[in-house]
Amino acid sequence: MIAACAGLPTIIAPLRSSLTLVVVALFVACCTIATPAAAQSDSGAQAQSQTVDSTRGPVTGSTRRIGLGGAFVAVAEDTEGVAINPASTAVRLPYSFQDWNVGFGLDVSVGAWLPKNDVYNQGNSASQDQTKADKSTALFGSVALLVNYRHFGVGVSAEATRNAASRANDTPGIDTHFAANFGTVHLNMAYGFLDGQLLLGAGPRLIGMSFDRAGSSSVLGTAGVGYEAGFLVKPIRQRYRLAAAVKSPIDAQLAAQPGIAASNVHVPWEVALGAAYQFGPRALNPRLVTAREVAQQTTGHQDPTDAELDHAALELFDRYEARQRWYLLVSSELSVIQGGGPVGLSGQMAMDRPVISPRVGLESEVIPHYLRLRGGSYYEPALIAGTHSRTHGTGGLDVKLFKWSVFGLLKPFNYWQLSLGADAARSYLNTAFSIGIWH
C-alpha cells in the first residue's frame, strides 16, 4: 500500500489516518459497548435533547463497490462483500481450488479534494444562509478477513469513517463544528445450500461512534448492536444473480454535558434489493470444483497424496487461465434507508422519511489478463430540508502490475494489481484505492 503511494504526499497522511481508524474500529465498537454508563444522561441537563439521524447519502466501501455506483448487493463477494451482504460470505470464487480458503482485504478512500467538498449535500452556495457548512470531508478505511470451508463461510469486516464539517452558526441541541467518527464491525456466517446456489447469511453489526466538538477537549462516545441478514441466488451456469440484504436499526445515547441534555443517535435500518446479469462467454456462477475432487477422479484414490493434490491444483489453474476472459457485467440495486431523526449529522434539520436510492453499474475486462474497467451511477436523495438531490457518476479500474510471489507464498496467483475508484457529483469528489492480487 505505502509503496503504491510513493511520490504522492497528499495521500500519505490520509492513508495513515484511515489505517489508524480501521485499527481502532474494533476498539470503538466493542469497548464502548462494555461501558454503557458513559452514555447515560445527566440529570442536571437543562437543554432539550435531540435525536441525531446518522444517515449518510454517498456510497462508501471498496474500490469495486464505488466504481459500480453502489450496485453491489448481488455481486458482492470475497472480503469486499462481508460488510454489504452477509450471504456473500459463502460465495466461492472461480479461482478458489481448495476446500479451505482464506482471504484478506484492505481499502482506503479519501473525500476531501474539493475546496468546498459537500459530503452531507447541504447546498454550499452563496445564495443560501450562513448555517450551511463551509466544507465537509470524509475519510474511509476498511479491513476484512474471510475464511471458507467448501460452502460454509465466516467473515469479519471492520470499517472506519471520519466525517468532519464546519459551519458559521450553531443549531441548538448539537454543536455543528465537529468531527463524527464511526467504527462498524460486521461478524457474519453464511452457508451455500443446493451446491452453493442458494446462499443465506446473518450476523451482528456492532457500531461505535464518537463526536469531537470544536473548541472543546471533550469527546462524546456511544455504541450499539444491531443485526443483518441476506440471501443470494446464483444458479450454476446461469447468467444472473438475485440478492437482498437487511440491516436492523440501532439506537444509542450520547452522554449529557452541563446545560445540554443527552442526545440520541439513530443508525437507520437499511434494505437493499439487487439483480445482476452477465453477457459474454465467461461464466458468472461456475460450480465449485476443488483440487481434491479432481485428484480423486484422475487417480481413483479417495485420499490423494500431497503431490497429486498439487498437480490437480495446477490443472485447475491452467483451466482458469485458459477460460474466456471477456464479459460485460450489469448490476443494479435499489437501496432503501430509513430516515430517523430531526437533526442530521451536519447539525441541520433532517427529513424524517425513507431514503430511496436506485443504483446501476457496469464492469468488463476490456484487455484480457491486464485491465478491467467499471462505471456506474446512483441517485442521492436530499437528506436535509431545503436542499436538492444529486446524481453521482462513478468509475474505477483494476490494472495488472508486477509479478511477486512473496517468497513463494502466493503461487500460482502471483501478479499484483492496483485498484482505483472515483465518485463525483455536485460539490462532491471521493477517491478510493487498494492493492491486491490479480485473478
What are these regions (language model features)?
Residues A3, G7, V22-A25, L373:
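N-terminal leader/targeting segments
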Residues A34-P36:
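N-terminal signal peptide c-region/cleavage motif recognized by signal peptidases
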Residues M1-S17:
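N-terminal secretory signal peptides that target proteins for export/translocation
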Residues M1, L26-F27, I84:
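Secretory pathway export signals and precursors
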Residues A3, V28-A29, P381:
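Secreted/extracellular small peptides and ectodomain modules produced from precursors
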Residues S18-T32:
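Bacterial N-terminal signal peptides
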Residues S41-H439:
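Subset of outer-membrane beta-barrel
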